[in-house]
């Protein structure tokens, strides 16, 4: 088994690839298979942001592994105006939905309840297969409502770490 504990800086070469959907890239503990069909165990530090497409990991045996975002069923949302798109983003954010933001569009994981809401808001919703790369969020690190022990969840804003738009 290829055992992985560490994220590393980008590398020019790698020995294996992990093709993972967003849910799998969000887990700190995961058993999966590499593209080369090798059994892999991920044991990453808890509380970190999800793995991103193109991120690199280092296995215990020294091998470098590249993470690839596997295409998955998404809703691609467009609207007839910037106001309507902003309103759709507001309502999705109010539901704490993981959201990928592009120039004039939004993408989110397929969900029939959210599709019905978006339809009611007048959005155009198209089902597509694509890699899902949602925003990390302004505060990153996790989602907590509890006030008990909140000093453990005092994350500084990460506004400077938003991904590059394509």
UniProtKB/Swiss-Prot annotation:
One of its GO terms (biological process) is protein-containing complex assembly. One of its GO terms (molecular function) is nickel cation binding. Coiled coil: none annotated. Pfam families: UreE_C, UreE_N. InterPro entries: UreE (IPR012406), UreE_C_dom (IPR007864), UreE_N (IPR004029), UreE_N_sf (IPR036118). One of its GO terms (cellular component) is cytoplasm. Keywords: Chaperone, Cytoplasm, Nickel, Nickel insertion. It is found in: Cytoplasm. Involved in urease metallocenter assembly. Binds nickel. Probably functions as a nickel donor during metallocenter assembly. Belongs to the UreE family. This is Urease accessory protein UreE. The gene is ureE.
């Amino acid at each position: 088994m290829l055992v992985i504990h560490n994220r590393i800086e980008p590398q020019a070469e790698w020995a294996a690839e992990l093709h993972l959907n967003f849910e799998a890239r969000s887990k700190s503990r995961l058993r999966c298979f590499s593209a080369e069909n090798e059994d892999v165990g991920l044991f990453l530090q808890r509380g970190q942001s999800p793995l991103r497409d193109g991120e690199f990991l280092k296995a215990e045996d020294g091998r470098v592994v590249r993470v690839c975002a596997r295409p998955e069923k998404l809703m691609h949302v467009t609207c007839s105006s910037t106001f309507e798109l902003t309103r759709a983003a507001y309502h999705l954010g109010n539901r704490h939905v993981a959201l990928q933001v592009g120039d004039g569009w939004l993408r989110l994981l397929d969900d029939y309840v959210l599709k019905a809401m978006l339809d009611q808001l007048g959005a155009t919703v198209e089902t597509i297969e694509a890699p899902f790369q949602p925003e990390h969020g302004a505060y990153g690190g996790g989602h907590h409502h509890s006030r008990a022990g909140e000093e453990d969840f005092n994350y500084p804003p990460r506004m400077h770490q938003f991904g590059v738009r394509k």
